[in-house]
């Protein structure tokens, strides 16, 4: 179609158009409902209307009419191709075009001869004139117009009937769909070129890709490109695939606001909505610290958990004592370098590793000494030993947030797997376990905890804290929601449907819970992945995915290890001060203290060196049982004497039979030390006392302590604190720490007849196994109901049993303390005595739990 052809058509039809303009003006009002029809059905509708009109007048369509219909159908197909482009124009322009097309269709319906003569030219004229606004036509009266308007009016009820007939509408629609499909197939090359041209003119939206940098736990950087609208889980999945990690639910991506504050990337939201600024830099960290790392399926997961804990120790987020640092550092060296080889390892090979925030030469020497004693320990075993000791630390897996209490005092709120912790001056002052928390919420910059009422309380109590900002309060609330859901629930909650003007946050943890993660990990069926260690690039020697180390069967350190003392810190429940040694002239004593807590994992036991003369061994077993009713107590006083007599008749095997402390956890020390080193150990004892005094409140001395001080050759300081548990019903555990100071011991006070005293040497070794997060200091000692002391003696031993009953917070607690003093001139198997005492205590009181075992050994050696 060209412009010249359209000009010729206008000249031929100028007179005919003037006649028809009046008709168009009159019929425009009646044809408004028809203008809503699509352009493709316009010509076919007119053909149907003409046939309907002739049928109503008694006429039948002739052969000429049928040929006209065919021509109109082909013309309408050509029109529909071109009208499709006009549909994309602005609305005002399209409305004008539709009006013109409807008017031209009416002209076709008025006279068949005019359409035959000017069929093609009229179509072209309509197409070219559609965008041009026509002048206002003059109204003319003509009988033919009335006829036409009447006929058009008659067609309107027919259209209404069609609308009421659904079957017809469906058939008509099907016919239109078929017609449109055919038209698409018959599309001309010219129309294809036009559509391609218009498509090329449209701006093509390309999704912008973002460059991400993720700092991994082995101090490497993983770079990748993600789509701009990618979610957090997409990036986390790519990082875990890069690291070959399948147990990815324990990990997360963090955005660090500063050196101490981080925000976890929400895996369910788009990354661009959580990141401020263009550089997308993240760190890959452990988000949920497993309470029992031994339950992890794969060694590679435990290895990355070890890397995270090493970072926490170096950064100061996981405080440790000197002995703990030395032990954990030795396992780190064993994991990275393997067994000690004098030819491969130099003198200062430990200095290449960063093991502590303030790493000293003394610490490196202790680490080397321990490392040299390990034999044939695989990297996977070293990692597991590392985790078994690290999980006992009090700050293990605690996410810290700065806050203030209602009085404006600075505190720190910590979130962990067991609940919410409150710290003040680096000491834990309160704890809210998840079972006791009813609701957590925030409002502006305030954070609130609603506590479940106790047995004697009627109403819930709400505790509030003030955080630096609204953003900090919301972040703490989200961390609490995630930890509670992950560790306490079996499945995640579904996000509630959005309501109109719904208040509160819709945030829910969207990942898998710990229970779901363990189920998925149990289905992992692949050989153990081979990976390289960080420092040494050693390949893992593990042959299976879950190489659990049997601590009872394996002793990684030989019995003839060099002597160093090692303790366990009370605040963290792990190995504590390095060597505690006090020497008094002309006398020698050896004191060995072992404190063992009942745990699901097998605890450990000391193996002291054999002594040469008179020995006194005291085993302090404290058994604590909770009762749900305040009035209900355990009637054990009458049975105690009989149980003590029957204890040697029972030899049942216990769950915690492997209570021996492995040599790998022993630090023995040579007896011959210089005066300068002795002063250091005096200072270490003072420091240990200070730590215990800060962590546990000092109560009144018990009756047994008064009696002991009158009969003991040295002064003993007992610090007792009550520690409530967090899981299940409230349970009060008692922690007893005994510190011996023999500086003022006098030779004449030693009650012995057989062996004179020349000198005394005291070595104090403290062991504490697996302190869980369920323990915390409590300032309320409770109300003492009864106290009873029973003493029984044999030729070689004296047993003192003290039974105390207290009530605290509606909970009745019965505590039984047994002191067994064994005297004799011959060597005694201390390990067997300790195991036997624990076994008898558990057999005598199966419904009670052993919370502490303290072994105190004194050795007096006479001059020759």
Swiss-Prot record:
SUPFAM superfamilies: PH domain-like, Second domain of FERM, Ubiquitin-like. Residues 1-16, 27-41, 149-158 have a biased composition (Polar residues). Residues 1-122, 136-170, 182-202, 518-572, 586-611 are annotated as: Disordered. GO terms for molecular function: 1-phosphatidylinositol binding; actin binding; calmodulin binding; phosphoprotein binding; spectrin binding; structural constituent of cytoskeleton. Residues 210-491 form the FERM domain. Residues 494-614 are annotated as: Hydrophilic. Residues 615-713 are annotated as: Spectrin--actin-binding. Residues 61-75, 101-117, 182-199, 587-600 have a biased composition (Basic and acidic residues). GO terms for cellular component: basolateral plasma membrane; cell cortex; cell junction; cortical cytoskeleton; cytoskeleton; cytosol; intercellular bridge; mitotic spindle. The keyword Cell cycle applies. InterPro entries: Band_4.1_C, Band_41_domain, EPB4.1_FERM_F1, Ez/rad/moesin-like, FA, FERM/acyl-CoA-bd_prot_sf, FERM_2, FERM_central. Residues 76-87 have a biased composition (Low complexity). It is found in: Cytoplasm, Cytoskeleton; Cytoplasm, Cell cortex; Nucleus. SMART domains: B41, FA, FERM_C. The modification Phosphoserine is found at residues 14, 84-85, 95, 104, 121, 149, 151-152, 188, 191, 521, 540, 542, 555, 664, 674, 684, 709, 712. Pfam families: 4_1_CTD, FA, FERM_C, FERM_M, FERM_N, SAB. Keywords: Actin-binding, Calmodulin-binding, Cell cycle, Cell division, Cytoplasm, Cytoskeleton, Elliptocytosis, Glycoprotein, Hereditary hemolytic anemia, Mitosis, Nucleus, Phosphoprotein, Pyropoikilocytosis, Transport. The modification Phosphothreonine is found at residues 60, 378, 736, 859. Residues 714-864 are annotated as: C-terminal (CTD). Phosphorylated at multiple sites by different protein kinases and each phosphorylation event selectively modulates the protein's functions. The modification Phosphotyrosine is found at residues 222, 660. Residues 601-610 have a biased composition (Acidic residues). Its main location: cytoplasm. Protein 4.1 is a major structural element of the erythrocyte membrane skeleton. It plays a key role in regulating membrane physical properties of mechanical stability and deformability by stabilizing spectrin-actin interaction. Recruits DLG1 to membranes. Required for dynein-dynactin complex and NUMA1 recruitment at the mitotic cell cortex during anaphase. PANTHER family: 4.1 G PROTEIN (PTHR23280), PROTEIN 4.1 (PTHR23280:SF12). This is Protein 4.1. It comes from Homo sapiens.
């Amino acid at each position: 179609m060209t412009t010249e052809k359209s000009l010729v058509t206008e000249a031929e039809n100028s007179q005919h158009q003037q006649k028809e303009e009046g008709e168009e003006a009159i019929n425009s009002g009646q044809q408004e409902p028809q203008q809503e029809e699509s352009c493709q059905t316009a010509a076919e509708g007119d053909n149907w209307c003409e046939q309907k009109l002739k049928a109503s007048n008694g006429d039948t369509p002739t052969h000429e009419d049928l040929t006209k219909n065919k021509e109109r159908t082909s013309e309408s197909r050509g029109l529909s191709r071109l009208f499709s482009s006009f549909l994309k124009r602005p609305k005002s322009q399209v409305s004008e075009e539709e009006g013109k097309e409807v008017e031209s269709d009416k002209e076709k319906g008025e006279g068949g001869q005019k359409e035959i003569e000017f069929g093609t030219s009229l179509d072209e004229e309509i197409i070219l004139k559609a965008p041009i606004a026509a002048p206002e036509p003059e109204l003319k009266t003509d009988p033919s117009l009335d006829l036409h308007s009447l006929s058009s009016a008659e067609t309107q009820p027919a259209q209404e009937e069609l609308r009421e007939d659904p079957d017809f509408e469906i058939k008509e629609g099907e016919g239109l769909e078929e017609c449109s499909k055919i038209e698409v197939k018959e599309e001309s090359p010219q129309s294809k070129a036009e559509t391609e041209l218009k498509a090329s003119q449209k701006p093509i939206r390309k999704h912008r890709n973002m460059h991400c940098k993720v700092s991994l736990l082995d101090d490497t950087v993983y770079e990748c490109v993600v789509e701009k609208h990618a979610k957090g889980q997409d990036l986390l999945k790519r990082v875990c695939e890069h690291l070959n990690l399948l147990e990815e639910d324990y990990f997360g991506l963090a955005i660090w606001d500063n050196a101490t504050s981080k925000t976890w990337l929400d895996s369910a939201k788009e990354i661009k909505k959580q990141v401020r600024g263009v550089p997308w830099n993240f760190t890959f960290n452990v988000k949920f610290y497993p309470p029992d790392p031994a339950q992890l399926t794969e060694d590679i997961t435990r290895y990355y958990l070890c890397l995270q804990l090493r970072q926490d120790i170096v950064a100061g987020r996981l405080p440790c004592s000197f002995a703990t640092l030395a032990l954990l550092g030795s396992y780190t060296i064993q994991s990275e370098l393997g067994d000690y080889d004098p030819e491969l390892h130099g003198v200062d090979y430990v200095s290449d590793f960063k093991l502590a925030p303030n790493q000293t030469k003394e610490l490196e020497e202790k680490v080397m000494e321990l490392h040299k004693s390990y034999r044939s320990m695989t990297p996977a075993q070293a990692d597991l030993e590392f985790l078994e000791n690290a999980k006992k630390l009090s700050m293990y897996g605690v996410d810290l947030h700065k806050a203030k209490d209602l009085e404006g005092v600075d505190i720190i709120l910590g979130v962990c797997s067991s609940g919410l912790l409150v710290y003040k001056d680096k000491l834990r002052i309160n704890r809210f376990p998840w079972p006791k928390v009813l609701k957590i919420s925030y409002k502006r910059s305030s954070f609130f905890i609603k506590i479940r009422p106790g047995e004697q309380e009627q109403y819930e109590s709400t505790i509030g804290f003030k955080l630096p900002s609204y953003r900090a309060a919301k972040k703490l609330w989200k961390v609490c929601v995630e930890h509670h859901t992950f560790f306490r629930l079996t499945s995640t909650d579904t996000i509630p449907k959005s309501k109109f003007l719904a208040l509160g946050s819709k945030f829910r943890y969207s990942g898998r819970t710990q229970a779901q993660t363990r189920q998925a990990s149990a289905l992992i069926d692949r050989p153990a992945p081979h990976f390289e260690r960080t420092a040494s690039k050693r390949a893992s020697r593990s042959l299976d995915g879950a190489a659990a180390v049997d601590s009872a069967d394996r002793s990684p350190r030989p019995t003839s290890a060099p002597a160093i003392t090692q303790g366990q810190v009370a605040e963290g429940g792990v190995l504590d001060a390095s060597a505690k040694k006090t020497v008094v002239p002309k006398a020698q004593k050896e004191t060995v203290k072992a404190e063992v807590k009942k745990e699901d994992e097998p605890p450990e036991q000391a193996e002291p060196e054999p002594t040469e003369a008179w020995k006194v061994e005291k085993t302090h077993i404290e058994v604590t049982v909770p009762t749900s009713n305040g009035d209900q107590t355990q009637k054990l006083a009458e049975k105690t004497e009989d149980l003590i007599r029957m204890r040697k008749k029972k030899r049942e095997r216990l769950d915690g039979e492997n209570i021996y402390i492995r040599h790998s956890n022993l630090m023995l020390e040579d007896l011959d030390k210089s005066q300068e080193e002795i002063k250091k150990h005096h200072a270490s004892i003072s420091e240990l006392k200070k730590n215990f005094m800060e962590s546990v409140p000092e109560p009144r001395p018990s009756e047994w302590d008064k009696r002991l001080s009158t009969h003991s050759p040295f002064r003993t300081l007992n610090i007792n604190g009550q520690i409530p548990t967090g899981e299940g019903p409230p349970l009060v555990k008692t922690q007893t720490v005994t510190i011996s100071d023999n500086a003022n011991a006098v030779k004449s006070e030693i009650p012995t007849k057989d062996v004179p005293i020349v000198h005394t040497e005291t070595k104090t070794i403290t062991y504490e196994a697996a302190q869980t997060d369920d323990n915390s200091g409590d300032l309320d000692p409770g109300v003492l109901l009864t106290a009873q002391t029973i003493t029984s003696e044999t030729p070689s031993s004296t047993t003192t049993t003290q039974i105390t009953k207290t009530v605290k917070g509606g909970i009745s607690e019965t505590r039984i303390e047994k002191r067994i003093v064994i005297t004799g001139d011959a060597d005694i198997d201390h390990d067997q005595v300790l195991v036997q005492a624990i076994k008898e205590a558990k057999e005598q009181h199966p419904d009670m739990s052993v919370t502490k075992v303290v072994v105190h050994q004194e050795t007096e050696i006479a001059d020759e």
